[in-house]
Amino acid sequence: MSLAVFSPCDVASKLLSEVVGEKYPKVDDDDSIVEPVTSLCLPQLSYEDFHHFSVIPLWNKTFPCRLATEWNPKNKKDAPPKKKNALVILERVASRSNQNAVSRVINILRSKVHLMFSSSNELPSSEDVERWKKSPETLAASEYGCNLFIQFLKEQTSENEVDFWLDCQKFRSSKMSSRQNEARRIFDEYFAMGSPKKIYIERYLWCVVQAYLVNDPGWRHTFDVAQAYVGLKLAKKSHKKFLEDPLYLDLVELVTSGVNYNKFWHDKLE
């Protein structure tokens, strides 16, 4: 699809007129069918659902049947509404520069068997773990807490969608010189036919992303709407749910028990 457009909103408007008429657009060559674009299975939209309020006008252009109210404060000093718990923590994870340490912690957290053989100095203190209960922000301040939460999100939703959201967030701050190649990498990894990490979205939205890739000057907005679409699927009170999840509760029991770490997990796994 080739569109002679000059702004992201122009892309959305043009595609809407071309695609919205399809009753059941196809997603892939396997003839999978998705819901019509006019009946997206998403919750009621509010400010807190969007990672950046600047994305809302573009979202409304793309999905006029699922409008979100734009934030127009009467006073410039008014604080913006709080974002969804998960978005606060995801943004912190995406901004971290030490990705090797992040990956190492995630590998430890993937299974209790790995954690069983980890050393005590790789674990947070009981005070740190208790502090995570205060708010999403205090959890986000902990690298270990962030990555435990990411593992929780992946188990609750989709690993590929969480990875896609994080890649999009890092893409937003990427250098202009590398943005074209990075945009192509993200598209190939999450949208290309046959990709093992492919995320499944509306055919219409897939076309929108493809059009941004070709026509968006600077590629700054290429994945804005797709990232928002994935973010809308995350539970609004995910911080509370995380604190009730066995992944967190088991860690609390471990760091507060004062027993030998290996013995603790040996007993848990029997």
Curated annotation (Swiss-Prot):
InterPro entries: RGS, RGS_sf, RGS_subdomain_2
Domain of life: Eukaryota
GO biological-process terms attached to the record: negative regulation of signal transduction
Keyword Transport tagged: no
Recorded phenotype for the gene knockout or disruption: Sterility and embryonic lethality.
Domain RGS: 135-252
UniProt-listed SUPFAM superfamilies: Regulator of G-protein signaling, RGS (SSF48097)
Alphabetic keyword roster: Developmental protein, Signal transduction inhibitor
Pfam families in alphabetical order: RGS (PF00615)
PANTHER family xrefs: REGULATOR OF G PROTEIN SIGNALING (PTHR10845), RGS DOMAIN-CONTAINING PROTEIN-RELATED (PTHR10845:SF259)
Function summary: Shown to have a role in viability and embryogenesis.
Name of the molecule in the record: Regulator of G-protein signaling rgs-10
The organism of origin for this protein: Caenorhabditis elegans
